[in-house]
Every structure is written in C-alpha cells, then in structure tokens.
C-alpha cells in the first residue's frame, strides 16, 4: 500500500529552512513539498477535482474557449486572467494563491486595495462579474 506524505505549509517549510544547518539535507527531506507542476497541470487537476468542464470554466472566467485552450497548451496568462480562472473555478483563497504562485505571480496581498477587494470576493463566494463590478465601482482596475 502506497502511503501519502503529508505536505508541509509554506510557513512550516520557511521555519524549517531557517533552522536547517545543511541545505542539502533540507532539500532531500522536503522533496515532496516542492511545487513542480506546470500551470496547465494544476488547472487540469483543479478542473477534475471540482468537476467543471472547460466550456463552463471559459464562460465563468469571462474568456473564450480558444484562449482557455491556449492556456492549457502552455500559454502564460496575465495575473488578472489567472484570477479570472480562480473565480471560474470557484477557488478558495488558498487555491487562488497557489495558482498565482505556480504561474509566477505575486500572491494577493490584503494591503493592496484592489487585492483586498478580490480576496473579499473569493472568501465570500462572489462570482467574477460581481467582483469586476465592485472593482469598477471602487475605481480599481477590473480583471478583464
């Protein structure tokens, strides 16, 4: 029987790294905790886990199916488009942060007004279009 290793959170890894006397030992002990998935692999995993079709994701993310297929084929979307995908996936804040990191973008930061509005939307189950309306009404850059 294959035993699944429990993944450590970022703070746990950071603390362990700070206390590590030997980098190689840290790297070897934590190999399973390092992210190696491409954005398209992570998106596919999230789609499957949430039972959402690509057509539905495109519609809920405010993008064309053609553009979505380009993302799944390896095209790197902008940070705003990644956030659109998060809303289309009904992602949790943690899932959104993971997808942003995986795509090479900064996490949402509550001290940034625009990010705070987006975080609120994710935490309160708002859809993309409601969040976009709120961003617009608050004179912040919309997601699309």
What are these regions (language model features)?
Residues 47, 58, 86:
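The alpha-helix within a helix-turn-helix
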Residues 74-87:
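Short, basic-rich loop-to-helix N-cap that marks the start of a DNA-contacting helix
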Residues 2-14, 97-125:
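Short, charged recognition helix plus adjacent turn
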Residues 55, 66, 94:
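Key DNA-contact positions within bacterial/archaeal DNA-binding proteins
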Residues 58-77, 102-104:
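Recognition helix of helix-turn-helix/homeodomain-like DNA-binding domains
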Residues 19-53, 131-143:
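A short, Lys/Arg-rich alpha-helix, primarily the initiator
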Residues 88-89, 113-142:
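Long, compositionally biased
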């Amino acid at each position: 029987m294959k035993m699944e290793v429990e993944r450590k959170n970022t703070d746990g890894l950071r603390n362990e790294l700070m206390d590590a006397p030997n980098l190689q030992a840290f790297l070897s002990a934590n190999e399973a905790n390092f992210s190696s998935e491409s954005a398209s692999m992570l998106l596919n995993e999230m789609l499957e886990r949430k039972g959402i079709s690509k057509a539905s994701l495109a519609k809920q993310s405010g993008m064309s199916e053609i553009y979505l297929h380009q993302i799944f084929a390896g095209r790197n979307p902008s940070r705003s488009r990644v956030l659109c995908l998060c809303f289309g996936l009904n992602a949790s804040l943690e899932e959104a942060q993971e997808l942003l990191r995986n795509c090479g973008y900064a996490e949402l930061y509550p001290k940034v007004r625009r990010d705070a509005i987006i975080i609120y939307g994710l935490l309160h189950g708002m859809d993309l279009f409601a969040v976009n309306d709120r961003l617009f009404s608050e004179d912040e850059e919309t997601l699309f």
